[in-house]
Amino acid sequence: MTNIIVNSPLDQFDIKVFIGFVSPFIDLTNINITTFTVYSVFILIVILGLTLLTDNNGRIIGNRWYVSQEAMYDTINNMVSGQIGGKLGGYYFPLIYTFFIFIFTANLIGMIPYSFAITSHMVFIISLSVVIWLGVTIIGLYTHGLTFFALFVPAGCPLALAPLLVLIELLSYSARAISLGLRLSANTLSGHLLMVILGGLVFNLMSVSIVTFVLGFIPLAGILAIVALEFAIAMIQSYVFAILASGYIKDGLYLH
């Protein structure tokens, strides 16, 4: 039976196998149901459930779930309209909103004690950002052809500096494939490690004696403040991911 108790600060990031598949005919060693699989499906179920709860049954004023979903919808819609604009903004809005709501829900579920934070795994998030980067590059090449490479030539740059500036712009553009996901994953990973380590220290302090138990409430209040800050960061990072993805799409469409 899989142990779900966190024994060290890094245990919460460990991918555990729940069900493994074996076949005498083909190699299925890499096809397993893991914590990552379970939490990914659970996140999708939560998103679907919250979406179904937004049904206001024909009432003029919706329930609290409807209002919250509408607020997030309008926020992302306004952001995409401001970034991309026009009909193309409406075309790419579902994609950006999907990124936002999935990452936001995953971050909130990852805040539950003893849960598994899928956004802390750099392989997953960076893979997602690489796919976005490749998609934006393909969109740019399909829309503008060879003119797309004008994106790497700063306007009005001297001819003598053009090779150096083009190299810098090319490296900057290529780094987007990593930086988009690395920013989210690093913030999630560091925040969770900080809470677990500080929580463990306070727990050990409060376990020593009655005096340290009482004194432990002082750092415990600080940890609760950090937890509140992490909830805010969970929302901010999902919005930052969405706005950067939208900005990258804008660069591919308009070359600026």
Swiss-Prot record:
> Topologically, how does it sit relative to the membrane?
Multi-pass membrane protein
User: What CDD domains does the record tag this protein with?
Assistant: ATP-synt_Fo_a_6
The listed locations are:
Mitochondrion inner membrane
Please indicate which superkingdom the organism of origin belongs to.
Eukaryota
Annotated Gene Ontology cellular component terms: mitochondrial inner membrane; proton-transporting ATP synthase complex
Record keywords, A-Z: ATP synthesis, CF(0), Hydrogen ion transport, Ion transport, Membrane, Mitochondrion, Mitochondrion inner membrane, Transmembrane, Transmembrane helix, Transport
Q: Where are the transmembrane segments?
A: 33-53, 92-112, 122-142, 148-168, 191-211, 235-255
- Job of this protein: Mitochondrial membrane ATP synthase (F(1)F(0) ATP synthase or Complex V) produces ATP from ADP in the presence of a proton gradient across the membrane which is generated by electron transport complexes of the respiratory chain. F-type ATPases consist of two structural domains, F(1) - containing the extramembraneous catalytic core and F(0) - containing the membrane proton channel, linked together by a central stalk and a peripheral stalk. During catalysis, ATP synthesis in the catalytic domain of F(1) is coupled via a rotary mechanism of the central stalk subunits to proton translocation.
Tell me its family: Belongs to the ATPase A chain family.
- Subunit description: F-type ATPases have 2 components, CF(1) - the catalytic core - and CF(0) - the membrane proton channel. CF(1) has five subunits: alpha(3), beta(3), gamma(1), delta(1), epsilon(1). CF(0) has three main subunits: a, b and c.
PANTHER family found in the cross-reference section = ATP SYNTHASE SUBUNIT A
Name assigned to this protein = ATP synthase subunit a
Gene that encodes the chain: ATP6
